[in-house]
């Protein structure tokens, strides 16, 4: 029996989400992760709804914060948006913000964890493109 009463606040240090759209999407994303069979303890930093530092849809910053621009995210189908959120949650869970490297290895590792959690990362990548090194990543982590 799946538990639908998941208190997502227990998984985050701090949450600043204003829009109902992002609240619902985060709830669905966390619920899917919790029920994926993933056996490690889930622990994430802060979630901030608003503009990202580098101007993209979502990012994890050095200070253990996931920033999401819900206005941009809202342009994607729900399964793509959830895969994108899961990808950023994977970066945070794996603590990639502590050991950022100027290559794409962590992008592939985050994709694989999001895939393990049951998200359609392949559709996300088909729609948004393969991971690539770009100025946004360099700006966030410099």
Where are these regions (language model features)?
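Auxiliary, metal-adjacent structural segments of Zn-dependent hydrolase domains
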Residues: 5-61
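Active-site scaffold of zinc-dependent metalloenzymes
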Residues: 45-77, 89-92
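Residue-level detection of beta-strand scaffold positions
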Residues: 83, 113-114, 118, 126-127
